[in-house]
């Protein structure tokens, strides 16, 4: 194994649900190897790992959570609205999210938090919500300005009241990707255990 040969410093997995994570953790522990991380989708618009207990399992096993897509394909940056939808495959998703009216409510809650922090970009609010849930967000950036804004999210934290406000607003938005329709594999190829288990 690359870890045992000293080629890598840590071992991590991606998109493992609770059962697959436990199986992997146990298998590695038998070889005296720590499972360092689980990279999963997580955001104000994709709370499934929080709701199904995966974040709790990661915490219990001392596995760091790397949360990808914390900006939910750009929908949590404030750049899109019902009148300004993205083009391409994300357009239908945008229509669904804005039709309910609840995404607008979430963005309004994010704007309230932003105002509490000198008008911080909504992207920073989204990133800091993930941080407040104990994850390490890994947002994408297309420009140097976006990369800098993402990094500046580390300069401040959400208060407990702000987290609560965002939790409540987020809970009103229907899941934009159903876990059982995820593009990721359903079962670990080695153990056969469900990755997006409930």
What is each model feature region?
Residues 1-169, 173, 190-198:
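Beta/alpha (TIM)-barrel catalytic core signal, keyed to glycine-rich beta->alpha loops juxtaposed to Asp/Glu
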Residues 178-182:
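Short coil/turn segments at secondary-structure boundaries
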Residues 183-188:
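Short, surface-exposed polybasic-and-hydrophobic patches located at secondary-structure transitions
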């Amino acid at each position: 194994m690359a870890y045992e040969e000293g080629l890598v410093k840590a071992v991590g997995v991606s998109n493992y649900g609770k059962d697959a994570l436990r199986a992997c953790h146990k298998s590695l522990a038998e070889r005296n190897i720590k499972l360092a991380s689980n990279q999963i989708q997580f955001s104000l618009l994709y709370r499934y790992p929080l709701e199904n207990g995966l974040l709790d399992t990661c915490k219990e096993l001392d596995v760091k959570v790397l949360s990808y897509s914390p900006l939910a394909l750009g929908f949590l940056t404030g750049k899109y609205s019902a009148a300004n939808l993205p083009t391409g495959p994300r357009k239908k998703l945008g229509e669904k999210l804005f039709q309910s009216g609840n995404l607008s409510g979430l963005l309004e809650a994010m704007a309230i938090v932003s105002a509490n922090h000198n008008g911080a970009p909504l992207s920073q609010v989204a990133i800091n919500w993930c941080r407040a849930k104990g994850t390490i967000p890994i947002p994408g950036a297309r420009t140097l300005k976006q990369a800098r804004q993402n990094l500046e999210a580390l300069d401040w934290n959400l208060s407990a009241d702000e987290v609560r406000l965002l939790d409540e607003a987020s809970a009103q938005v229907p899941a934009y990707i159903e876990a059982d329709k995820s593009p990721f594999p359903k079962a670990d190829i080695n153990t056969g255990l469900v990755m997006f288990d409930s």
